[in-house]
Amino acid sequence: LTDTFTYTLSDEHDATDTATLTITLLGQDNEAPSATDNTNAVNEDETVTVTNGTSGVTGDVLINDTDPESDTLTVTKIKKSGGSDSNVSSGSSYNSSGTSVTGTYGTLTIGADGSYTYTADQDAADALDAGDTENDVFVYTVSDGNGGTDTANITITVTGTNEPPVAVDDTDAVNE
């Protein structure tokens, strides 16, 4: 962006001179990216994996995030809702140096590329009856690499399943 001004100087003897001042704006303020909440669902005894760029799957944390300058976005932090931030290693994916955070009903592992996996913890989810649902909520930070950041939630809905009873063979002896 360039702006030009013409100005005239004069002295006490009425002598004048005209010049031009040109101002060129070399940079602009970086605008922060916009992170959008994500959702996914899993049964209490399953794992859900979402890889970067998977279209049509709600949960890929970068595919629905935007940046006004079209900067490349990365995930830089993750935490359980209400917990403390954990840094996410740059260049990582969920299965290669990803950062793991334990929630109430399972563990989320996320990479800087936005890919993640959530593994439900069977023992933690045993309290859920068949068909009952509870949410595990995580907060991630997305960065544009130029100082702009935003946060959004990853909400995993965990559904209880009906675990069949386990029969154990027994033996006993009785006197006649």
Sequence positions of predicted segments:
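Acidic, turn/loop-rich segments in luminal/extracellular domains of secretory-pathway
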Residues: 1-29, 89-160
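Extracellular ectodomain surface segments
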Residues: 30-101, 163-176
